[in-house]
């Protein structure tokens, strides 16, 4: 979707509030952004219809689920043809531990963020899942020590 230059400051306020508190009732949202409920509801529907709001999601607590460690993995494939890239991307999409995966430029082909239960959980993920995906030539991993910022999306 192309950037809509029609976003005004109230639209941006709505998006900022919903980004953090998607379960707010319309009356509460309207109060927070300085609108009455009816125009607020209309604006939210317009933002949804225009594609600015893709979905409303629950952000799960990884530690509570026994997956308190985040690992960033950089992967290089042995081939770079379209078929290999397609198959590798499909395989990543099927791995439940994978939170995010990006095809990238630079030294590595992929940037993958996974949630695991410690080093033992990470070793299990590598042996039983990731390294069974064909085509990996090299990987490098880093455990995240602390999350300093996490946003699902920016608001201009």
Locations of regions flagged by a protein language model:
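A compositional/biophysical signature of low hydrophobicity enriched in polar/charged and small residues
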Residues: 1-156
């Amino acid at each position: 979707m192309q950037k809509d230059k029609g976003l005004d400051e109230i639209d941006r306020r709505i998006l900022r509030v919903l980004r953090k508190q998607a379960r707010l009732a319309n009356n509460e949202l309207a109060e927070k952004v300085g609108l009455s409920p009816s125009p607020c509801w209309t604006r939210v529907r317009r933002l949804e219809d225009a594609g600015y709001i893709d979905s409303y999601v629950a952000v799960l607590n990884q530690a509570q689920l026994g997956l308190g460690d985040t690992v960033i993995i950089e992967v290089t494939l042995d081939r770079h043809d379209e078929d290999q890239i397609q198959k590798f991307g499909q395989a990543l999409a099927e791995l439940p531990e994978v939170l995010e995966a990006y095809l990238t430029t630079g030294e590595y082909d992929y940037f993958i963020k996974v949630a695991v239960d410690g080093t033992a959980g990470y070793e299990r993920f590598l042996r039983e899942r990731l390294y069974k995906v064909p085509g990996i030539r090299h990987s490098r991993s880093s455990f995240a020590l602390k999350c300093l910022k996490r946003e699902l999306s920016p608001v201009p």
